[in-house]
Amino acid sequence: MSRQFDYRATPPQPAAAVFAAMVDADCLRARLSQLGGRNAALLEHEADAEYARFRVQHGLEPEDMPSAVRSFLPSDFKIVRLETWRRDGDGRYAGMADVDVPGTPADASGQMGLRDAGTGSELRIRTDVAVKVPLLGGRIEDSVGAQILKLLAKETAFTLDWMSRNA
């Protein structure tokens, strides 16, 4: 069984500008440099105004994770996330994310939407987290989900700041 977590942000910029920044290779590299942890990397990247596909690697320290999760983590703990986005009409983008956590009984996936809203835009992400550990899986899913929501907020803030510095 998995648990769902919802994230929502309302950037002041239109969806096309937010999309362009979110999938920009320079922005992704800068974001990973600041937020990605040890051995963070942009592993694959292709993007244009209609479509984007990229794979990123985050390196995380087990001691930075909740205690309920630590015993299940390898010492070289990393997360590999593949995102694909496509333009879905004027001012609308739809995306999917698949998250691989090698060496753990956990995985995650997500559906993403970005659309124009008023003078800005709205970003919505629904993440499904599954941890296959008897009796503790639900508690670990809650911990991992909370960490994902924090990371999404930090990534959004970084991207919006990057946009303002690179306008």
Task: Map each language-model feature to its residues.
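Hydrophobic ligand-binding cavity/cleft-lining segments
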Residues: M1-P62, A68
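Hydrophobic pocket/interface hotspot
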Residues: V18-M22, I125, T159
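Short secondary-structure junctions
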Residues: A30-G37, G89-R92, T104-P105
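Amphipathic hydrophobic-ligand
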Residues: G36, S71-V80, T104-G110
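Short, ordered beta-strand-loop transition motifs
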Residues: L43-R53, R87-D90, R115-G118
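Beta-strand/loop substructures that line and gate deep hydrophobic ligand-binding cavities in soluble
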Residues: R55, T84, Y93-G145
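Helix-adjacent hinge/juxtasegments
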Residues: E61-D88
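A conserved amphipathic terminal alpha-helix motif
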Residues: R86-R87, G137-A167
